[in-house]
């Protein structure tokens, strides 16, 4: 991957490994969308658009030769730069076990937030509709644990009516979930009751959304399409610091909105 220019960086193999490993650790916990949507690819840096399998006919009816354009989603290319102190990185070679990578860590969190923003809320300029865009798939939910369980049962009833199989997953705002746990009563934990309702699915708490949604994880309904997966490259050297960047190319497609239900508190 020459475009990353990693071989030009004044960094050792051990330093690159530490940077990559730390970024991977944070991405693993902060990429909430990837915990329940299908991930396709990566198809490579040159993959510029994802075909939608449709043709928009643009020719007139009276034309002998009919023609149109194939529909596709252009990939979003993101790039976020950060700097690291070279002397601090050299401390890694001296045996220091916990070098300061705070600039990297903060940038990784911002990149993860951007990807999740596209998955949940979409990106109008790139033609992406996010999961929360489908207001017609919304049901109201009260503020008690009983209300939550009833809303999940209603959501599953809608899935059954629409022929959407499970397992099902509850994606819920972290603070909302904590408040439900505080209010739960009885000897049987709320978490267990919810998991039983979801029929083999799971509970994902996230700060990315204000309310909640129930989704089917049967597969094929929500696709995160990757060209170049999250990667770190070299940009420049600034005296005693090195400027690096995180890049990714991707798009997101809701293939079947019937596989999600929004819960509005």
From Swiss-Prot:
InterPro entries: ENCAP, Encapsulin_nc. Coiled coil: none annotated. Its cofactor is FMN. Keywords: Encapsulin nanocompartment, Flavoprotein, FMN, Ion transport, Iron, Iron storage, Iron transport, Transport. Its main location: other. Shell component of a type 1 encapsulin nanocompartment. Assembles into proteinaceous shells 23-24 nm in diameter with 2-2.5 nm thick walls. Cargo protein Flp (ferritin-like protein, may store iron) is targeted to the interior via its C-terminal extension. This encapsulin nanocompartment is formed by 60 subunits; monomers form pentamers which assemble to form shells. There are 12 pores where the pentamers meet as well as 3-fold axis channels and dimer channels; none are larger than 3-4 Angstroms in diameter. The N-terminus of the protein is inside the shell, the C-terminus is outside. This is Type 1 encapsulin shell protein. It comes from Thermotoga petrophila (strain ATCC BAA-488 / DSM 13995 / JCM 10881 / RKU-1). The lineage of its organism: Bacteria, Thermotogati, Thermotogota, Thermotogae, Thermotogales.
């Amino acid at each position: 991957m020459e475009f990353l220019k990693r071989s030009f960086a004044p960094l050792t193999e051990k330093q690159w490994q530490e940077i990559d490993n730390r970024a991977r650790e944070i991405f693993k916990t902060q990429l909430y969308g990837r915990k329940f949507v299908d991930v396709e690819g990566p198809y490579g840096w040159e993959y510029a658009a994802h075909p939608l399998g449709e043709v928009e006919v643009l020719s007139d009816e009276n034309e002998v030769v009919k023609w149109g354009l194939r529909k596709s989603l252009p990939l979003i290319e993101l790039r976020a730069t950060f700097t690291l102190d070279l002397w601090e990185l050299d401390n890694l070679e001296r045996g220091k076990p916990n070098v300061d990578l705070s600039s990297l860590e903060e940038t990784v969190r911002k990149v993860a937030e951007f990807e999740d923003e596209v998955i949940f809320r979409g990106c109008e300029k790139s033609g992406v509709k996010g999961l929360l865009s489908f207001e017609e798939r919304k049901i109201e939910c009260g503020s008690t644990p009983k209300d939550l369980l009833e809303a999940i049962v209603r959501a599953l009833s809608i899935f059954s009516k629409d022929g959407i199989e499970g397992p099902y997953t509850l994606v819920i705002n972290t603070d909302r979930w904590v408040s439900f746990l505080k209010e739960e009563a009885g000897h049987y934990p709320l978490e267990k009751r919810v998991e039983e309702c979801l029929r083999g699915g799971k509970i994902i708490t996230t700060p990315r959304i204000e309310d909640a949604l129930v989704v089917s994880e049967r597969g094929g309904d929500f696709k995160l399409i990757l060209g170049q997966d999250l990667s770190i490259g070299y940009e420049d050297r600034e005296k005693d610091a090195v400027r690096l960047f995180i890049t990714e190319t991707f798009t997101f497609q809701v293939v079947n909105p019937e596989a999600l239900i929004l819960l509005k508190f």
